[in-house]
Amino acid sequence: MIGLIQRVSEASVCVGNEVIGEINQGILLLLGVEKNDNEEKAKKLFQRVLNYRIFSDQDSKMNLNLQQVGGGLLVVSQFTLVAQTNKGNRPGFSQGASPELGKTLYNYFVELGRSSEILCESGKFGADMQVRLINDGPVTFSLNV
């Protein structure tokens, strides 16, 4: 499971012309599910996202996590994160989860967020979405579990 996290001052996701998820300060997470992923990996990644210290403290050091700053989490499915790009001119997706597994684990991840004490918003799995964000920093990290 791959999570690309971006520290944002605001972010939103639209399907068509409708905003279906939005946050102010927080983390935009692009989530890629691989074929060998499971609920345990989703839990592990969720805890890493929640506790990853990417927000600045009073000394301008990245020392605070999402909960400590009261930030929101916007989760968006991103199948292309799992692409193999090491050769050729076209990405390969053989490591990607089946649509059924991907949707199940994506929804499970979102439910982990919604059952926590943070604001958790979501895109729509498998939809053609437009994502808008203001990347704060910019600060972007790839988390793999």
UniProtKB/Swiss-Prot annotation:
Gene3D superfamilies in alphabetical order: D-tyrosyl-tRNA(Tyr) deacylase
Comment, domains: A Gly-cisPro motif from one monomer fits into the active site of the other monomer to allow specific chiral rejection of L-amino acids.
Single GO term (MF): tRNA binding
Keyword annotations of the record: Cytoplasm, Hydrolase, RNA-binding, tRNA-binding
Record motif Gly-cisPro motif, important for rejection of L-amino acids, residues: 137-138
Function, as annotated: An aminoacyl-tRNA editing enzyme that deacylates mischarged D-aminoacyl-tRNAs. Also deacylates mischarged glycyl-tRNA(Ala), protecting cells against glycine mischarging by AlaRS. Acts via tRNA-based rather than protein-based catalysis; rejects L-amino acids rather than detecting D-amino acids in the active site. By recycling D-aminoacyl-tRNA to D-amino acids and free tRNA molecules, this enzyme counteracts the toxicity associated with the formation of D-aminoacyl-tRNA entities in vivo and helps enforce protein L-homochirality.
Domain of life (superkingdom): Bacteria
One family name in Pfam for this protein: Tyr_Deacylase
GO CC field: cytoplasm
Enzyme class: hydrolase
Record protein name field: D-aminoacyl-tRNA deacylase
Species for this entry: Pseudoalteromonas atlantica (strain T6c / ATCC BAA-1087)
Catalytic activity reported: glycyl-tRNA(Ala) + H2O = tRNA(Ala) + glycine + H(+); a D-aminoacyl-tRNA + H2O = a tRNA + a D-alpha-amino acid + H(+)
E.C. designation(s): 3.1.1.96
HAMAP family linked to this entry: Deacylase_Dtd
InterPro entries in alphabetical order: Daa-tRNA_deacyls_DTD (IPR003732), DTD-like_sf (IPR023509)
